[in-house]
C-alpha cells in the first residue's frame, strides 16, 4: 500500500512507513526555519527546437527563468518587467510556488547564473552575469572547468555557512535534458525515465542530443562530477552541487524541490563524496515534487536506480495538489500532463499542506492570481515574446 500523510505520498521502493513518517515529521518541524533558494540558470541546450515547453520558442525561453523569478518574488503586478512566456497549454508553475510562498510566509533568495542579463530585483550574485549561459551540451564542452569549480566553491561556501535548513528550487529551460545527460555520463540508462515539461517527452530528440554531447566530451577514466558538468551539464548543477554538499557538512536538512534535475544533483553529490559517508549524507535530504510528475513518468524508478547504484536509502515525497475542480483551462491542463513541475512547485505545495492549508485554498488562490495575471497582461498573448 502506498504510504500517505495529508495526501502527501511516498515514492521510491526503499521507503518504509517508519522512514516516511519520520521524514514528514522532520519537514513539518522545520517549515518556519527554511532558507529558500531559487536558482535560475541558462543553457544554450534550451535553444534546440522541441526540447522544452518553457516558452513557445527559443526567443521566449531566454527570459523564462527571469519571468519566473520575478513572479515568484512579486506575484501579479502592473509594473512587471518580464512577461511570462505564452504556452500552448498550462501556465508557469511559478504561480503555484508564489501562492504557497504567501501561505507559508516564505521569502526567496534568487540566484541567477548564466542568464546574460542582470536582474533588477534583489538577488545573490555568484558570478559575473556576462559569463552567459552554458554552451549547448552537443558541444561536449558546456562550460570550462574553472567556471564549474568556481560555481561549486561558491555554493559550497554558502552551504557550509548556513545555520538553517535550505530549500532549493530551479528554473532552467532545457534542464531535464542536461539532467539526463549527467545521469547517462555516469552509466545510467534513463532515457525512458526522464520526464519533460511537454506532455509527450521528446525522448528520441533528447537521446540524439545527448549521444552527440557525450561522444564529443569523450570522458576519460577517473572523471568526476565536475568533469561531467563541464562536459554536458549546466550552471544550476555546479552551484547546487556545492550548496547541497556544504549544507550537509553544516549538518542542515536540504529539500531539493523538483524532479529529474534534482535527482541529477543528488547523483552528482553521491559520485563526488566519500563512499563511507553516503547514507549519513542522504539521511536529511528530501526530494519533493508534484504528483503530476510522479504520475507522468517513472520518477520512482529513476530514484531507485540512483539509490541502488550507491546503496543508500532515499525516498521521494509527492504533493497531493490537484486542479480537478478548477474552472481555468490553464490549471486543469496540469491534470492531463502539461507543465507538471518547476520553480519548486512540488516542495512549496507540500509545505503548504503540512502547514494546514487545504487543496481548495491553494486552488482558489491560484485562480485569483491567474485572473490578475491576465488582467495585468503579465502573460504574453503573442507566440513571440
Curated annotation (Swiss-Prot):
Domain of life the protein comes from: Bacteria
InterPro entries named in the record: Nict_dMeBzImd_PRibTrfase (IPR003200), Nict_dMeBzImd_PRibTrfase_arc (IPR002805), Nict_dMeBzImd_PRibTrfase_sf (IPR036087)
Name recorded for this polypeptide: UPF0284 protein PMM0439
Organism this protein belongs to: Prochlorococcus marinus subsp. pastoris (strain CCMP1986 / NIES-2087 / MED4)
GO molecular function: nicotinate-nucleotide-dimethylbenzimidazole phosphoribosyltransferase activity
Family affiliation: Belongs to the UPF0284 family.
Amino acid at each position: 500500500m502506498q504510504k500517505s500523510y495529508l495526501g502527501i505520498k511516498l515514492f521510491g521502493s526503499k521507503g518504509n512507513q517508519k522512514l516516511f513518517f519520520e521524514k514528514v515529521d522532520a519537514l513539518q518541524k522545520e517549515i518556519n526555519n527554511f532558507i529558500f533558494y531559487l536558482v535560475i540558470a541558462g543553457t544554450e541546450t534550451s535553444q534546440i527546437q522541441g526540447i522544452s515547453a518553457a516558452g513557445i520558442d527559443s526567443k521566449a525561453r531566454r527570459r523564462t527563468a527571469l519571468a519566473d523569478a520575478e513572479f515568484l518574488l512579486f506575484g501579479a503586478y502592473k509594473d512587471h518587467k518580464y512577461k511570462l512566456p505564452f504556452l500552448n497549454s498550462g501556465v508557469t508553475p511559478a504561480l503555484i510556488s508564489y501562492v504557497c510562498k504567501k501561505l507559508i510566509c516564505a521569502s526567496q533568495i534568487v540566484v541567477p547564473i548564466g542568464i546574460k542579463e542582470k536582474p533588477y530585483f534583489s538577488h545573490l550574485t555568484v558570478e559575473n552575469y556576462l559569463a552567459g549561459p552554458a554552451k549547448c551540451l552537443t558541444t561536449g564542452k558546456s562550460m570550462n572547468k574553472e567556471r564549474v569549480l568556481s560555481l561549486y566553491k561558491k555554493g559550497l561556501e554558502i552551504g557550509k555557512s548556513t545555520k538553517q535548513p535550505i530549500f532549493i528550487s530551479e528554473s532552467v529551460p532545457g534542464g531535464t535534458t542536461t539532467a539526463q545527460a549527467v545521469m547517462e555520463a555516469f552509466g545510467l540508462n534513463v532515457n525512458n525515465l526522464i520526464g519533460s515539461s511537454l506532455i509527450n517527452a521528446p525522448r528520441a530528440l533528447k537521446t540524439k542530443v545527448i549521444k552527440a554531447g557525450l561522444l564529443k566530451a569523450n570522458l576519460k577514466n577517473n572523471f568526476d562530477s565536475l568533469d561531467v558538468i563541464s562536459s554536458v551539464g549546466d550552471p544550476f548543477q555546479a552551484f547546487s552541487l556545492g550548496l547541497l554538499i556544504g549544507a550537509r557538512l553544516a549538518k542542515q536538512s536540504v529539500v531539493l524541490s523538483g524532479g529529474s534535475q534534482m535527482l541529477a544533483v543528488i547523483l552528482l553529490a553521491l559520485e563526488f563524496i566519500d563512499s563511507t559517508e553516503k547514507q549519513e549524507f542522504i539521511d536529511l535530504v528530501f526530494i519533493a515534487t508534484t504528483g503530476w510528475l510522479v504520475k507522468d513518468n517513472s520518477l520512482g524508478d529513476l530514484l531507485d536506480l540512483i539509490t541502488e547504484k550507491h546503496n543508500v536509502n532515499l525516498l521521494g515525497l509527492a504533493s497531493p495538489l490537484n486542479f480537478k475542480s478548477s474552472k481555468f483551462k490553464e490549471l486543469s491542463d496540469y491534470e492531463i500532463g502539461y507543465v507538471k513541475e518547476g520553480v519548486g512547485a512540488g516542495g512549496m505545495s507540500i509545505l503548504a499542506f503540512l502547514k494546514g492549508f487545504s487543496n481548495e485554498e491553494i486552488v482558489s488562490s491560484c485562480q485569483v492570481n491567474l485572473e490578475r495575471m491576465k488582467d495585468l497582461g503579465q502573460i504574453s498573448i503573442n507566440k513571440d515574446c
